[in-house]
Amino acid sequence: MEIVASLIKLFFGSKADKDRKQIEPYLQKIKAVYPSIEALSNDELRDRSEALKKQIADFIARDEADIVELKAKLELPETSLEEKERISKQIDETTKRIDEKIEEKLDEILPEAFAIMKDTARRFAQNDEVVVTANDFDRDLAAEKDFVRIEGDKAIYANHWMAGGNDLKWDMIHYDVQPVSYTHLRAH
């Protein structure tokens, strides 16, 4: 039986080989975009992250607006039961389409998103503090957490925090191969 398995692997490649071939384009794109991400200021890095979120929101905005309209029609007293069933089916189909569009957009932006995540981790691993222009999120977080403080118009994030009575320090930079998990899960 081992001979047959060896022959199959010889002619068709192993599962690991197939997985590597599948993720190689992502890895090359991440490596290509990473230097431009690494060159950004902390605020520019944050802006790029927000731009990715906006791309997703814009990509599904029309479908989300359609769902709002359909739900409003569902609530009208004059809407018949048959019409409510048809509208509910439309909502379900539109929700499914939104999920598919989100997956499509996530696949498209994965290299840049991963490069942003990796470089953010690098900044925290290599610096005791990461300083950005404060926004409402930072102010709200600073009111509740001790790893961020506000000084003037700046939010200062510490790379360490208390957890379970222990002072923990961020010291991890993501490996380029970590998108393997995402692409592998998406394929199966």
Predicted regions and their residues:
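Helicase-associated low-complexity/disordered flanking segments
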Residues: 1-177
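Conserved small/polar residues in nucleotide/adenosyl-binding loops
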Residues: 183-188
